[in-house]
Amino acid sequence: MTANRLTLSGTVCKAPMRKVSPSGIPHCQFVLEHRSQQVEAGFNRQVWCRMPVIISGKAHQAITQSITVGTQLTVQGFICSHQGRNGLNKMVLHAEQIELIDSGD
């Protein structure tokens, strides 16, 4: 199996951390909070999640500089398990496309 795609929209809820790897690749990490109403088995359901997101590479560096807490985004990429310092695994979205959502203000 090779299918692994996720598209998620939401609001950045934790301040982005920006760093550059020893090989010179820029990385931006943040947490995206998603809230929506979905239909499941014919019933409306309120859904909510927080997804850690990593976006890497110089091609995305300009757009990641404009990301702050409260920024609304749609991201698309693949999911991967990362082991934290506490030894627990967490799901992380590795974004390959990122789009700022105009809030209309």
Curated annotation (Swiss-Prot):
One GO MF term: single-stranded DNA binding
Cell membrane among keywords: no
Keyword Cell cycle attributed: no
Pfam families: SSB_1
GO cellular component: a single term: primosome complex
Every SSB domain range: 1-102
Entry keyword set: DNA replication, DNA-binding, Primosome
GO terms of biological process kind: DNA replication, synthesis of primer
Highest taxon listed in the record's lineage: Bacteria
Record's subunit section: Homodimer. Interacts with PriA and DnaT. Component of the replication restart primosome. Primosome assembly occurs via a 'hand-off' mechanism. PriA binds to replication forks, subsequently PriB then DnaT bind; DnaT then displaces ssDNA to generate the helicase loading substrate.
Job of this protein: Involved in the restart of stalled replication forks, which reloads the replicative helicase on sites other than the origin of replication; the PriA-PriB pathway is the major replication restart pathway. During primosome assembly it facilitates complex formation between PriA and DnaT on DNA; stabilizes PriA on DNA. Stimulates the DNA unwinding activity of PriA helicase.
Family: Belongs to the PriB family.
Protein name (record): Replication restart protein PriB
